[in-house]
Amino acid sequence: MAKAKEVKAKPIKGEEAEKLVYEYLRKTNRPYSATDVSANLKNVVSKQVAQKALEQLRDTGLIHGKLYGKQSVFVCLQDDLAAATPEELAEMEKQIQELKDEVSVVKTLYKEKCIELQALNNSLSPAEIREKIQSIDKEIEETSSKLESLRNGTVKQISKEAMQKTDKNYDFAKKGFSNRKKMFYDLWHLITDSLENPKQLWEKLGFETEGPIDLN
C-alpha cells in the first residue's frame, strides 16, 4: 500500500504571518532569529517573511530585538515590559550591564584570592608560621631589651653608628614581624572562613596574641 503524501501547509505572509510569529514568540517566551522562527514553524512563514514580521512587531513595541554580530534576535515582551517606555528599557539594559560588570569584578577578585591562598599554602604551613612568629617575638624582645639598656646608659656606651645600626635592625625585625603576622592572620581567616567557631580551633592549637583580636 502506497504511503500517503504529507500535505504541506500553505505559506502565509502579511498580517497573518505577523500574528502567527507573535503568538509563537509569546508562547515559547524565548529569543529567536528569523531563521529559527521560520524553521520552527515548518517554513509556513519563509525566512524573509519572518524577518519582516519580526521587524514590524519590534517597531510596534510588541517584541524586543537586539543585534548580535550579523544576526538579529527577537523575544516577546512580558506584560510589564510591553508597557515600558524606550527610556525605561534603556535603563533596564543599563542596570543589566552594571550587574554584569559587578559579576566580572567579583570573578576577578575571587581568582586573585585563590592565587593568594595557593601562594600561602605553597609557602608556610600554620605550624611553620607559628614557629616563625615565636622566633621573631623572641628576637624583638631581646633587641628591645638591649636597646633599652643602651638608651638608659646601664651598659658601656657605643658609637652613634652602632646605635643607628641597632635601631635599623630593630625596625627591620619589627617590620618583618608585622608582615608575617598579617600573612598569618590572612591565612587564618581564609582557612577558618567556613568554621562556626574559629576561636575554639585557635585555643586548641595553642595560639597566643599580644592583645584582643577578631578571630571570626
UniProtKB/Swiss-Prot annotation:
This is Homologous-pairing protein 2. Required for proper homologous pairing and efficient cross-over and intragenic recombination during meiosis. Acts indirectly in a process facilitating homologous recombination. Acts during mid- to late-horse-tail period. GO terms for biological process: homologous chromosome pairing at meiosis; meiotic joint molecule formation; meiotic strand invasion involved in reciprocal meiotic recombination. It comes from Schizosaccharomyces pombe (strain 972 / ATCC 24843). Its main location: nucleus. InterPro entries: Hop2_WH_dom, WH-like_DNA-bd_sf. GO terms for cellular component: chromatin; condensed nuclear chromosome; cytosol; DNA recombinase auxiliary factor complex; nucleus. Keywords: DNA recombination, Meiosis, Nucleus.
